[in-house]
Amino acid sequence: REIMGQRAEAYIVDAIRTPTGKRRGSLATVHGADIGGFILKALVERHDIPDDEYEDVVFGCLDTIGPLAGDIARTCWLAAGLSDVVPGTTVDRQCGSSQQAVHFAAQAVMSGTMDVVVAGGVQTMSSIPISAAMYAGQPYGFDNPFTSSEGWVARYGTQEISQFKSAQMIADKWEISREEMEAFLSLIHI
């Protein structure tokens, strides 16, 4: 917490990686809440902090529809059999969702709002194919999240703007070559 006007420090005290698998592989039928719950339970068991003393669970997840809908962060926590007094929130910043979850957790600690926060993420591409959320509104009369918005159409038109299209538009605007991008990626890829 804040002490005499000083900002609190935030520390990552542990990290557990969710299992990864191939599309339609051995993990394809495992619910995302169980995958996330597995690591949350393991994390709590590795530390001497009662599960009801965690103040929040912040998880990143994109395409939060179907089995990943309904605040998957809290669902993972509860699926792990952990305390039902701990809230959770799910962050969708697309491919940066889990990273953003870590930032939000750190900000909560550094602001003095919380002391113990769990951050991470879960995604199951076998249960929710990439871009499925883009078209989930079609049965309700919405082609995709953008083209029904007058403001969006006025600004960008009706063309689809995916991450891939956006990357190309950014590269063109700022004259970034593929070689420059790959050199940058080699510095940040872990």
Mark where each language-model region is.
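Phosphate/pyrophosphate-binding loops at sites that engage ATP/ADP/AMP, CoA/4′-phosphopantetheine
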Residues: 42-53, 170-175
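Condensing-enzyme catalytic core mediating Claisen C-C bond formation in acyl metabolism
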Residues: 3-33, 42, 172
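Conserved catalytic cysteine-centered active-site region
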Residues: 61-115, 157-163
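N-terminal cofactor/phosphate-binding cores enriched in small/glycine residues
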Residues: 36, 40-43, 47-49, 60, ...
